[in-house]
């Protein structure tokens, strides 16, 4: 995507190299020791490079070609004049001096490029050695000390504390940790612990408090199904999981900072904010004028289940969508308290992937969540992945009774957490997503959008081209196969007869050439993409501003896929975590996506001016139906239905 060596890069490298050489040569001619000569070379070279870079890549200089040329000539003339005076003063001819500097001017830029390529090659080789062809899915080498650090628990602080790292909220004073670029607060409770008599009950607000607490360590992740490729299974889990994490950029601003709130992914059954892929340090470090928040919510049998038809189940009327109620409670806490952290409660952008994206879409249609966020970045999620009736959740409740050999709600409430967790592991196939109940979530989410339920919310919607392999890498081959066959078998429930016939005919032709599992995987992936595309249409028809993004990058290891994992890492700048997931981040692409996300959060136009990011041309992200297409490390804006992709093939098949 980024040009490896633009003319601007050449000018900066050329003048900086002259600076390195100038520092070394002057020091040597002055009789300084070798060590001092090297030090002088490095100091002058780095200082000059930083100074020249700020000038050359400033918005004013990049505004026109004439400005750029004038700037290059002026800088070069000033520097050469200074060098000439210095060299003549020391009695050395300019020709001798330039011969001395030749190695610096030519060699240093080339050496820097070679070193960067070697580092990248080493990282790729290390990943390939660990993952092989990727057929085993995600295999994490989690260090014991990292697990122990993540699993530490915050404690009350009875005595003195560091006031510089403390923030007073309505629910307590929280003492975080400060580093060079951010201050972080981890494991802050946003609701009463849903344990004991509050198990399977709606989240309750915390009382006001003046107590002081540590906020240095992540709270426990939700109790969850532990899949083969889930990293969160290595960390502490508990029913007491309703906590959030806040990272504040170090830049002081006159006005409150915009806020980015992350909803974690995991198919509503696994995942959590302790996943290194979702860490919030790097984004506010790069963009210090904003606040980043992530949080946990209840999952699986603790978050999405219907007890209404079992004895005593009427006492838990909200169990059907508890995970969504937790999310609303988190957003309410954020809106009430984020001002204490320097955030703006009226400029909240939510971002979610997979089930996190689906959650956001449901909350956008939910009256109870009205006004809790103003913008949404959703990737690979759709309201069509939720249930239209509570039948499946009621069946799950009955299965849970059988698995735990209980017969009443009272019996379930008395069970130990581990007993329920073990039962959930055996019931993973039957786990439920949220349900449109007509109470919290409208019966018809698309109609709600049409009627203006999501009015006032801007959307960026993302689609991936290779998400199925990512899912396989997370859950393992057997679970993946079971899930794909089940999902495709359920498709007729969402299709009219004509469309269903077209889909089955398409599937039959694909199966003949690639095998049943691969064909159904492709169909599932394509169908999800079409559902997301339809979502963009519905939101636009409802009057919402919509931008579309299509991720079509190839994965480093084909069998691991390229989708949510790569996008999350690129947007949040978590390159080290991405290596754990078997890939290497394209730093240029990540920088561009982070810049566009920051503009979106801040309310600026979604465009890049020339060389705003060094080596990247001007770019304008036009509104839907145009899409930002990310492919082969490059950006372009076009409609995705003009691409010769499998999505287009399926669309054409249905149209026929």
Model-inferred region functions:
Residues 265, 322-326, 354-357:
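Active-site loop->helix "elbow" adjoining a glycine-rich segment at hydrolase catalytic centers
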Residues 118, 125-310, 314-320, 583-593, ...:
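Non-catalytic accessory segments of hydrolases
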Residues 352-355, 367, 380:
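Catalytic nucleophile serine of serine hydrolases
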Residues 225, 530-656:
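Mobile gating loops/cap/lid regions near enzyme active sites that modulate substrate access
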Residues 341-353:
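Alpha/beta-hydrolase fold nucleophile elbow
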Residues 316-339:
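Alpha/beta-hydrolase active-site loop
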Residues 230-232, 329, 336, 370, ...:
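Substrate-access "cap/lid" subdomains that shape
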Residues 357-369:
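Short glycine-enriched nucleophile-adjacent loop
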């Amino acid at each position: 995507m980024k040009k490896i060596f633009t003319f601007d890069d050449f000018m900066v490298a050329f003048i900086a190299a002259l600076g390195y050489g100038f520092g070394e040569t002057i020091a040597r001619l002055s009789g300084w020791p070798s060590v001092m000569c090297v030090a002088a070379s490095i100091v002058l070279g780095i200082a000059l490079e930083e100074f020249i870079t700020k000038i050359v890549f400033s918005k004013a200089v990049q505004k026109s070609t004439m400005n750029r040329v004038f700037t290059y000539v002026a800088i070069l003339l000033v520097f050469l004049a200074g060098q000439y005076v210095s060299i003549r003063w020391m009695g050395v001819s300019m020709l001798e001096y330039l011969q001395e500097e030749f190695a610096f001017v030519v060699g240093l830029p080339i050496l820097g490029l070679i070193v960067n390529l070697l580092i990248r090659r080493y990282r790729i080789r290390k990943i390939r050695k660990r993952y092989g062809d990727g057929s085993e899915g995600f295999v994490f080498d989690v260090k014991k000390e990292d697990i122990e650090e993540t699993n530490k628990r915050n404690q009350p602080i009875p005595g003195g504390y560091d006031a510089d790292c403390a923030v007073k909220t309505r629910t307590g004073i929280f003492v975080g940790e400060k580093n060079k670029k951010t201050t972080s607060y981890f494991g802050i409770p946003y609701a009463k612990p849903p344990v004991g008599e509050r198990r399977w009950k709606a989240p309750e607000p915390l009382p006001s408090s003046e107590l002081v607490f540590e906020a240095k360590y992540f709270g426990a992740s939700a109790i969850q199904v532990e899949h083969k490729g889930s990293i969160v299974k290595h960390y502490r889990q508990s029913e007491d999981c309703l906590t959030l994490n806040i990272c504040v950029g170090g830049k002081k601003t006159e006005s409150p900072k915009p806020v980015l709130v992350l909803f974690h992914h995991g198919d509503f059954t696994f995942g959590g904010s302790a996943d290194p892929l979702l860490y919030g340090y790097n984004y506010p470090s790069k963009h210090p004028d904003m606040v980043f928040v992530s949080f946990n919510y209840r999952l699986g049998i603790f978050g999405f289940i219907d007890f209404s038809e079992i004895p005593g189940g009427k006492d838990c009327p909200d169990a059907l969508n508890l995970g969504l109620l937790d999310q609303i409670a988190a957003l309410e806490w954020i809106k009430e308290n984020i001002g204490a952290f320097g955030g703006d409660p009226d400029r909240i952008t939510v971002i979610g992937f997979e089930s996190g994206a689906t959650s956001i879409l449901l909350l956008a249609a939910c009256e109870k969540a009205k006004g809790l966020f103003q913008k949404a970045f959703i990737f690979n999620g759709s309201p069509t992945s939720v249930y239209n009736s509570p039948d499946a959740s009621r069946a799950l409740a009955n299965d849970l009774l059988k698995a735990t050999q209980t017969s009443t709600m009272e019996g379930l409430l008395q069970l130990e957490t581990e007993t329920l967790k073990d039962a959930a592991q055996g019931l993973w196939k039957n786990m439920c997503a949220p349900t449109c109940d007509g109470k919290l979530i409208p019966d018809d989410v698309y109609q709600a959008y049409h009627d203006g339920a999501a009015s006032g919310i801007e959307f960026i919607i993302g689609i991936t081209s290779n998400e199925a392999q990512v899912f396989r890498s997370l859950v393992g081959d057997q679970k993946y196969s079971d899930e794909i066959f089940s999902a495709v078998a359920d498709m007729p429930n969402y299709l009219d007869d004509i469309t269903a016939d077209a889909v089955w005919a398409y599937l039959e032709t694909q199966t003949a050439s690639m095998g049943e599992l691969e064909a159904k995987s492709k169909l599932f992936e394509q169908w999800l993409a079409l559902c997301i595309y339809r979502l963009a249409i519905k939101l636009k028809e409802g009057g919402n501003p919509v931008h579309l993004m299509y991720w079509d990058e190839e994965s480093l290891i084909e069998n691991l896929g390229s989708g949510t994992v790569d996008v999350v890492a690129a947007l949040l700048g978590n390159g080290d975590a991405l290596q754990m997931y078997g890939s290497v981040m394209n730093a240029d692409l990540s920088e561009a996506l982070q810049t566009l996300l920051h503009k979106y959060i801040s309310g600026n136009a979604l465009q890049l001016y020339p060389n705003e990011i060094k080596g990247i041309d001007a770019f304008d992200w036009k509104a839907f139906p145009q899409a930002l297409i990310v492919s082969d490390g490059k950006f372009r804006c076009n409609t995705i239905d003009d691409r010769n992709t499998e999505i287009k093939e399926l669309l054409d098949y249905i149209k026929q």
